[in-house]
Curated annotation (Swiss-Prot):
Belongs to the aldehyde dehydrogenase family. RocA subfamily. It catalyses: L-glutamate 5-semialdehyde + NAD(+) + H2O = L-glutamate + NADH + 2 H(+). It comes from the Bacteria. It is an enzyme of class 1 (oxidoreductase). GO terms for molecular function: 1-pyrroline-5-carboxylate dehydrogenase activity. It holds the Pfam family Aldedh. GO terms for cellular component: cytoplasmic side of plasma membrane. InterPro entries: Ald_DH/histidinol_DH, Ald_DH_C, Ald_DH_CS_CYS, Ald_DH_N, Aldehyde_DH_dom, Proline_metab_enzyme, RocA, RocA_bacillales. HAMAP family: RocA. The active site is at 286, 320. The keyword Oxidoreductase applies. This is 1-pyrroline-5-carboxylate dehydrogenase.
Length: 515
């Protein structure tokens, strides 16, 4: 008997036992730093001379692991293995596939702090952010397993006298999963298991900044009983391995999470039909956002300020859902801005391994350079209220940065920065605020802080984002509670952690029998 789904509780680190357990997990992870990790193709460990070196973004000299790097030849080998495995994996009972997810979730739950501690080191996540990432990975496994059990017999359709009609779902084929570094466990695991539980085989190309956590998860799936060849772990260059697999005639679908530019490139390439290809590839893409929090004159201003700070600076603003635009009605603009600046100045930036750190580093040198360039642009486009400094001598640290009086069409109000930078703009009234909120090419998340029911209802209709929050921040969607995914250039309108997500990984078949 499968229990009803409930999200995984977050760890309370004010409890000393939990704090000690996490410190022990950090020591365990530190003892394993610098190891070599192979590719996994058909269950075989394959070692290459060329490596992806994963480093700690809070301490550039600390190597997390050296991961073998796939090339085109190994990608082709993995494709052949996955294509062959699909023939029998697609016929495995959905109940058996769901059971593997349940077992994997149980394994991760037992090793929860270990996975979180690894993300503290590999992704630079503070304790709470890492803990939430692991909890979300567990949630995806638990939720998608249950969703597959709901979908396994299809959906009832009508039948006439003397006729029986059945409508059910079958797997697609080989899926290429290209996962991001910002949720290196949750999104990587979620996109992978959604593909697997629906009966597809997977080539997993994790982000080059965070490949070790993906390897550890591949090991978990093996331990949970996933047969060899169903999941193949092949980190490598996007330009070499990524393009090759997106173009491959045997690739049936691509599940991508990452930047707008790479998403567009994948979407374009996947549309081309190559010799030997007998289907149109499907692309499931989540591509980022330029997310705003709107504050009305009838808002709880303390709640507004705290929501902006948490959403803008949690995990250094490196979330596609992060608040990078604060759109404040002019009546309360100065009060909200000044309180946000006060709160921002109180944030502790430092090594995420220290429990008291609110904000750690950004992920790597190129991210650091890009964000610092945007801060320079911001100094021209707005009034720097706090932050603006960076230090990449030891790790990639940037102070949380607030710009005021920014034009709604300015670059820092329109372009995704993916760092700890929030821009404030003033709206004449609530209607004007909504107009500004909708004036980007994205449509992922947004929030409205207001006590005015009519304004909330207006926003419900008119604020064009996939995830809209009232009287809270715009980050932190929970699997099964707030299905996640956006509109416009934020992706293909898919909703991860939602009731229709698995269907994107399957195709429907109708069988009609006369008697």
């Amino acid at each position: 008997m499968v229990q009803p789904y409930k999200h995984e509780p977050l760890t309370d680190f004010t409890v000393e036992a939990n704090r000690k357990a996490f410190e022990e997990a950090l020591k365990k992870v530190e003892a394993e730093l610098g190891k070599d990790y192979p590719l996994i193709i058909g269950g075989e460990r394959v070692t290459t001379d060329e490596k992806i070196v994963s480093i700690n973004p809070a301490n550039k000299t600390e190597v997390i692991g050296r991961v073998s790097k796939a090339n085109k030849e190994l990608a082709e080998k993995a494709m052949k293995v996955a294509d062959e495995a699909f023939k029998w994996w697609s016929k495995t009972k959905p109940e058996a596939r769901a059971d593997i997810l349940f077992r994997a979730a149980a394994i991760v739950r037992r090793r929860k702090h270990e996975f979180s501690a690894l993300m503290v080191k590999e992704a630079g996540k503070p304790w709470k952010e890492a803990d939430a990432d692991t909890a979300e990975a567990i949630d995806f496994m638990e939720y998608y397993a249950r969703q597959m059990l709901k979908l396994k017999d299809g959906v009832p359709v009508e039948s006439r006298p003397g006729e029986t009609n059945r409508f059910f779902y079958i797997p697609l084929g080989v899926g290429v999963v290209i996962s991001p570094w910002n949720f290196p466990f949750a999104i990587m695991a979620g996109t992978t298991v959604a593909s697997l539980v629906t009966g597809n085989t997977v080539l997993l190309k994790p982000a080059s900044a965070t490949p070790v956590v993906a390897y550890k998860f591949a090991e978990v799936l093996e331990e949970a009983g996933l047969p060899a060849g169903v999941l193949n772990y092949i980190p490598g260059s996007g330009a070499e391995v990524g393009d090759y697999l997106v173009d491959h005639p045997r690739t049936r679908f691509i599940s991508f999470t990452g930047s707008r530019d790479v998403g567009i490139r994948i979407y374009e390439r996947a549309a081309k039909v190559h010799p030997g290809q007998i289907w149109l590839k499907r692309v499931i893409a989540e591509m980022g956002g330029k997310d705003g929090i709107v504050v009305d004159k009838e808002a709880d201003l303390e709640l507004a300020a705290q929501s902006i700070v948490a959403s803008a600076f949690g995990f250094s603003g490196q979330k596609c859902s992060a608040c990078s635009r604060a759109i404040i009605v002019e009546d309360v603009y100065d009060q909200v801005l000044n309180r946000v600046v006060e709160l921002t100045k109180q944030l502790k930036v430092g090594d995420p391994a220290d429990q008291s750190t609110f904000m750690g580093p950004v992920i790597d040198q190129s991210a650091y350079n890009k964000i610092m360039e945007y801060i320079e642009i911001g100094k021209k486009e707005g009034r720097l209220m706090t932050g603006g400094e960076g230090d990449d001598s030891k790790g990639f640290f940037i102070q949380p940065t607030v710009f005021a009086d920014v034009d709604p069409n300015a670059r820092i109000m329109q372009e995704e920065i993916f760092g700890p930078v929030v821009a404030f703009t003033k709206a004449k009234d609530f209607d004007h605020a909504l107009e500004i909120a909708n004036n980007t090419e994205y449509g992922l998340t947004g929030a409205v802080i207001s006590r005015n029911r009519a304004n909330l209802e207006k926003a419900r209709e008119e604020f064009h984002v996939g995830n809209l929050y009232f009287n809270r921040g715009c980050t932190g969607a929970i699997v099964g509670y707030q299905p996640f995914g956006g509109f416009n250039m934020s992706g293909t309108d898919s909703k991860a952690g939602g009731p229709d997500y698995l269907i994107l990984h399957m195709q429907a078949k109708t069988v009609s029998e006369m008697f």
